[in-house]
From Swiss-Prot:
InterPro entries xref list: Emc6, EMC6-like
Lineage: Eukaryota, Metazoa, Chordata, Craniata, Vertebrata
Regions of this protein lying in the Lumenal compartment: 45-50, 107-110
Record's protein name: ER membrane protein complex subunit 6
Subunit structure and binding partners: Component of the ER membrane protein complex (EMC).
Transmembrane domains' residue ranges: 29-44, 51-71, 90-106
Keywords from the named record: Endoplasmic reticulum, Membrane, Transmembrane, Transmembrane helix
GO terms, biological process: autophagosome assembly; protein folding in endoplasmic reticulum; protein insertion into ER membrane by stop-transfer membrane-anchor sequence; tail-anchored membrane protein insertion into ER membrane
Membrane association type: Multi-pass membrane protein
Segments on the Cytoplasmic face: 1-28, 72-89
Pfam families: EMC6
An annotated GO cellular component: endoplasmic reticulum membrane
Amino acid sequence: MAGVALKREGPQFISEAAVRGNAAVLDYCRTSVSALSGATAGILGLTSLYGFIFYFLASFLLSLLLVLKSGRKWNKYFKSRKPLFTGGLVGGLFTYVLFWTFLYGMVHVY
């Protein structure tokens, strides 16, 4: 009986400040990847549907990397897995389009 560890059952307490901090880190990652992938799409000269497909592929790759980084203990850092996949997706799209059109214009038009 000496080798039996006692587990404390009950509600799991989550720090709201830590949750907000983790959400801010996710938002920063999404914004950075959106800007970088938008610049890449503009330099590569991607247009119309290919440009949007490139954004969603880059966003999916980031989501996959975030899930791999959080590992099996994702509930230690987030309330649900949904923010890892969809958090900041639309806001990142606006950043992507901004960098995409700017660099496309600078490289291929002027």
